[in-house]
Amino acid sequence: MSRSYYRTRIKFCGMTRAGDVRLAGELGVDAVGFIFARESSRRVAPAEARAMRQAIAPMVDVVALFRNNSKEEVREVLRTVRPTLLQFHGEEDESFCRSFNMPYLKAIAMGGREEVNARTLQLRYPSAAGFLFDSHAPGGGGGTGVAFDWSRVPTGLHRPFLLAGGLNPENVYDAVLATLPWGVDVSSGIELEPGIKDGYRMRTFVEEVRRADCTVLE
């Protein structure tokens, strides 16, 4: 996706504490994510996410992440949390994803061996607001803390994409330069333990993304 200026969007995912949500806003992060996937160690209840939502700064997106949840589970989150963007990490098809009449990202597993084709993705999910390339294998979940080969990101996408999977303050500079993503998504790379973010790593991650943006513009 061609761009005449460059600012990589940043999403912090797997938030479980209001203080971390508040710091994300102070650092200028564009979106925070709450995980509702049943098997995730960072899963929060809708009521917990609603309480943390009060700490979100203005103009910061609230992303609700699902993986093979039922329609009723998704609707409960919509009613309780009022997210601005949905993110689907499972085997959800196009019909399921668009049935909630909200913008959504579809996560694509990059941990397998098969080639990921941009045209195929866009035909399979024509209503997606964008795609998120993560390092999990097909059928698996995200949050592994392991990066994939960034050269496998498909070319020819005509909508935004986010890079995820194993990103951290030590490698995100190189990741941005290698893939020029619309945005980056991080969870375990800024944590002390699952769901518990580290303020120093949060701040350093943002600084490294901005340093990469300045390099792109040179």
From Swiss-Prot:
Q: What Enzyme Commission number(s) does the record list for this chain?
A: 5.3.1.24
Q: Which GO terms describe its biological process?
A: L-tryptophan biosynthetic process
What pathway is it annotated to? Answer: Amino-acid biosynthesis; L-tryptophan biosynthesis; L-tryptophan from chorismate: step 3/5
Q: List the InterPro entries.
A: Aldolase_TIM, PRAI_dom, RibuloseP-bd_barrel, TrpF_fam
Q: Name one GO molecular function term.
A: phosphoribosylanthranilate isomerase activity
Q: Which reaction does it catalyse?
A: N-(5-phospho-beta-D-ribosyl)anthranilate = 1-(2-carboxyphenylamino)-1-deoxy-D-ribulose 5-phosphate
Q: Per UniProt, what is one Pfam family of this protein?
A: PRAI
- Official protein name in the record: N-(5'-phosphoribosyl)anthranilate isomerase
Instruction: Name its species.
Output: Stenotrophomonas maltophilia (strain R551-3)
Q: What is the lineage of its organism?
A: Bacteria, Pseudomonadati, Pseudomonadota, Gammaproteobacteria, Lysobacterales
Q: Gene name, please?
A: trpF
